[in-house]
Design a protein with these regions (language model features):
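N-terminal signal peptide c-region/cleavage motif recognized by signal peptidases
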Residues: 18-22
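Short loop/turn motifs that connect adjacent beta-strands in outer-membrane beta-barrel proteins
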Residues: 23-25, 55-61, 97-105, 155-166, ...
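N-terminal ordered "arm"
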Residues: 25-61
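Long, hydrophobic/aromatic-enriched structural stretches that serve as scaffold segments
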Residues: 56-123
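Outer membrane beta-barrel transmembrane domains
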Residues: 27-29, 33-38, 73-78, 192-298
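Transmembrane beta-barrel strands of outer-membrane/channel proteins
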Residues: 28-34, 63-69, 107-113, 166-176, ...
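Residues that define the transmembrane beta-barrel architecture of outer-membrane proteins
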Residues: 42-48, 84-88, 103, 140-148, ...
Length: 298
C-alpha cells in the first residue's frame, strides 16, 4: 500500500509538472507602450495590447485587441507636425517556435478615426497624469484599418548556454494605412535559458508575447538596431477639410533599442527603451518611448 501511495504521489507530481510546462506556453499578456518614459507627449505617444495565447499542437494561437495613439507635439507648436490619430484593432496571430527560430503571422482588422477611442483613452489617462490639452479635431473621419504582418526571428550561429548570441529579425507589415518592410539585429546576453528565448514587439513590429521554453528563473539584457523601408503611412494624413498639409513621409527610418527580459515560472516580463529617427520631413527631432510586456501563464 505504501509503495502504491508513493507511485501515485509521483504520478501526480509529474502531471503537475507537465501542466506547468504546458501553461508556460499559454496565458494572458499585456503590452504597454508610452513616451512617458522620456517625459514627452508627442508622435507615437501610447499603445496597448491585451491578448490571450493558447497552445494548438506544435504552435500557439493568439487573439487580442490593440490600440495605438499618435499626436502632434503637445508641449510646443511646430509648423510641420502630424495630426492626432488612433487605431483600434482586433488581432489574431499564429506563432511557430522552436529554439532559435520564431515565426509570427498576424492579421489585424479594425478602424482608424474617432471610433478608435483615442481621444477618450487619452483624456482618461490625463485625469491622473497631467499633460497639455490635445486638439482631436485634426483627425480624419473613420476609415477601415486592416493589415497583415509576418516576421521571423532567428539565432545566428550556434548558441551556447551562458554566452552572448546574435539574433536576426526581418519581416513586413502590409495594410491599407501603413506598409513597410524591416530588418534588424539583436545582441542578447544573460543567465539561464528562459529569458534568452524572449524578444520585444518593438523589434518585431508584431504580436510578441514574452514566452519562453524553459521555466527556470533567469534574466537577459539586449541591445538591438533595426531599419524599416516605409512604402506609405496614412496615419500622417490630416482631415481633408483642414488647412494643414500632410507632412512628407521619410521612407527610411532607423530604430535603436535596449532593454531586459526576466522569466520565472509565475510570470515573464520584457522592458525596452526605443529611439526612432524622424518619420517625416520637418519633424523637429527623433522620438523615444518605452515598451513593457507582461505575461502570466495560467
Amino acid at each position: 500500500m505504501a509503495g502504491r501511495g508513493v507511485k501515485r504521489a509521483l504520478a501526480a507530481l509529474a502531471a503537475c509538472a507537465a501542466l506547468g510546462a504546458s501553461a508556460a506556453d499559454e496565458g494572458w499578456y499585456l503590452q504597454v507602450d508610452n513616451d512617458v518614459f522620456y517625459g514627452t507627449d508627442r508622435w507615437y505617444t501610447s499603445g496597448a495590447r491585451i491578448a490571450r495565447v493558447k497552445s494548438r499542437g506544435d504552435h500557439q494561437v493568439e487573439i487580442g485587441v490593440l490600440q495605438e495613439i499618435y499626436t502632434p507635439e503637445a508641449k510646443r507648436h511646430n509648423d510641420i507636425d502630424r495630426p492626432n490619430a488612433a487605431r483600434l484593432l482586433a488581432t489574431v496571430a499564429r506563432h511557430d517556435r522552436v529554439p532559435g527560430d520564431w515565426r509570427t503571422l498576424e492579421l489585424d482588422l479594425g478602424v482608424t478615426g474617432p471610433s478608435a477611442l483615442g481621444r477618450q483613452a487619452q483624456e482618461f489617462v490625463h485625469r491622473y497624469v497631467s499633460a497639455p490639452h490635445e486638439d482631436w479635431s485634426h483627425q480624419r473621419p473613420d476609415r477601415f484599418d486592416g493589415q497583415a504582418s509576418w516576421v521571423r526571428t532567428r539565432t545566428l550561429g550556434q548558441e551556447s548556454s551562458g554566452s552572448p548570441h546574435l539574433d536576426a529579425t526581418y519581416g513586413a507589415v502590409l495594410g491599407n494605412q501603413v506598409a513597410f518592410a524591416h530588418a534588424g539585429l539583436e545582441l542578447r546576453f544573460g543567465t539561464g535559458g528562459a529569458a534568452r528565448d524572449m524578444s520585444s514587439p518593438a523589434l518585431r513590429f508584431a504580436a510578441t508575447p514574452p514566452l519562453s521554453f524553459a521555466q527556470d528563473g533567469s534574466w537577459s539584457f539586449f541591445l538591438a538596431l533595426s531599419t524599416r523601408a516605409v512604402a506609405w503611412n496614412h496615419l500622417l494624413d490630416f482631415a481633408p477639410d483642414l488647412p494643414q498639409s500632410t507632412p512628407r513621409l521619410r521612407h527610411a527610418v532607423q530604430r535603436f533599442l535596449g532593454g531586459f527580459a526576466w522569466s520565472h515560472r509565475l510570470a515573464q516580463v520584457t522592458f525596452v527603451l526605443v529611439h526612432d529617427t524622424r518619420e517625416f520631413v520637418g519633424q523637429r527631432r527623433d522620438h523615444g518611448f518605452g515598451s513593457l510586456t507582461v505575461h502570466v501563464p495560467f
